[in-house]
């Protein structure tokens, strides 16, 4: 069995790790970085991922996609998506199935399809390090992701050519990374995970019994639309408002200017974690009839904190709920772990310290812990890590809609997964021949306020008075937190089963098509790389041959020189084309034509060597042996 890699597919940055021997190791990407920006850019005929995509964002804002994780598994009509439409420089569009898709270079794409590009880069990073093909992966998701978002993340993995062995929750992965090598008995930890786009809190108990460590999630809570991007947006809005106040120009209608402001805001936010004041200085941000305009705004840490105070406060509410669900108080928490880049903000650290009454641990890398934990889980699944048991939970309750628009829960939130639950229901009317099973996820009693995961019909029920037929509904929640539902008429034995796919979501056929497109692109990328290599080789040989022709001078016969010049011209012509084989053939032809040149170069080198040796010998012959005598100076 090949290695199973661990991937933290983040909103802002992604990270990949693998078990190297018995120790998890974060793998550096082609740019030498341990994390990769989750940014994808579409340019003419090329897809850029990571730092190269981020670098060109200012000049290509409409086709540079970032924070796609905020859209994954979401409907276009969702309130959060509508909020993002206002602030994203790229187009968010409604797909035929009602999902939120994006548009770049005139092409509509599903969020999993775009996220797959980041996963492909993570896969390639791991393959370059391991020197072998990688197919298996553990991918992390926010603990508070619903069924549709988990399913969409698995789809992204499939499109990237990965077999997703397990989807695990980010805080749980961080706990694995933290607790694996910690000795000293049982502990209860709180993982506060504030990333680029999502927030989670998980209360996890680590028990050690006879050498086996059990990581049991007691409760989880969060907000899948709260993160560093929101902090950035507060600062962006402030900078734009200040500029408008000062210059009377609204930058919001200028995508290029907004992209520059976005980059500057992110940089300023990071700087303000270690300094009390910074300058946002953007020369030539825009221009009007009076000439170019420059942005130069001082931002203090206090100002930034006042802009985001309510966001930090918003993250504290789920902490209270999670503790209550786990039936614990803050005094029961042994350690607090901070995960996610946004937790580097001093105000966030101060509020968490104040809430728990203790300083968070400093020995966990907030950017890498999640990927490291995913790699550990990969090792567990591959059988390389023994004595570790992970017991995760479902973040939200699951149930079906029953008479009067009520949600009847079959699986309560914070139930350990995998789990199975069933309940018997009946008909609401006399002689009803079919029932609709409407599957819901959420905590509200009114069905309409919960997330609809899908619905299906069970038909062929024998006519009977209402309340008589017995319909058994079974919920089977797997280890990835994905739901499978079946309904069975106990009298006739008729059964209907489905794996819940959101009323939107991608069908198997759509995923397959995207997988094939990704494969085709892979082939095209490979051909492009081979062609570029052949062209580079041609350039080197042309340059080297011309230099040798020059050095040979009169020693090269005119007919040989003409032959070489012709071969060079033909290679230059082939190099302009797209045919790798033709370039390689002309390279061989030039090398054959330059055979005489090689001989002359060899003869010249030998002649030079001979004359150098002769010169050295004659110098030796001219040496005069002399005797020195000491001259004493008698002068006093």
Curated annotation (Swiss-Prot):
Highest taxon of the lineage: Bacteria
Biased segments, Low complexity type: 601-618
Modified residues (Phosphothreonine): 198
Keywords: ATP-binding, Chaperone, Nucleotide-binding, Phosphoprotein, Stress response
Tagged with keyword Ligase: no
Presence of keyword ATP-binding: yes
Biased composition (Acidic residues): 619-636
Ranges for region Disordered: 600-636
GO molecular function: ATP binding; ATP-dependent protein folding chaperone; unfolded protein binding
Gene3D superfamilies membership: 1.20.1270.10, 3.30.420.40, Actin, Chain A, domain 4, Substrate Binding Domain Of DNAk, Chain A, domain 1
Database matches in InterPro entries: ATPase_NBD, Chaperone_DnaK, Heat_shock_70_CS, HSP70_C_sf, HSP70_peptide-bd_sf, Hsp_70_fam
Induction pattern: By stress conditions e.g. heat shock.
Record-linked HAMAP family: DnaK
PANTHER family: HEAT SHOCK PROTEIN 70KDA (PTHR19375)
Assigned protein family: Belongs to the heat shock protein 70 family.
Functional note: Acts as a chaperone.
This protein's name: Chaperone protein DnaK
Organism of this sequence: Vibrio vulnificus (strain YJ016)
Taxonomic path: Bacteria, Pseudomonadati, Pseudomonadota, Gammaproteobacteria, Vibrionales
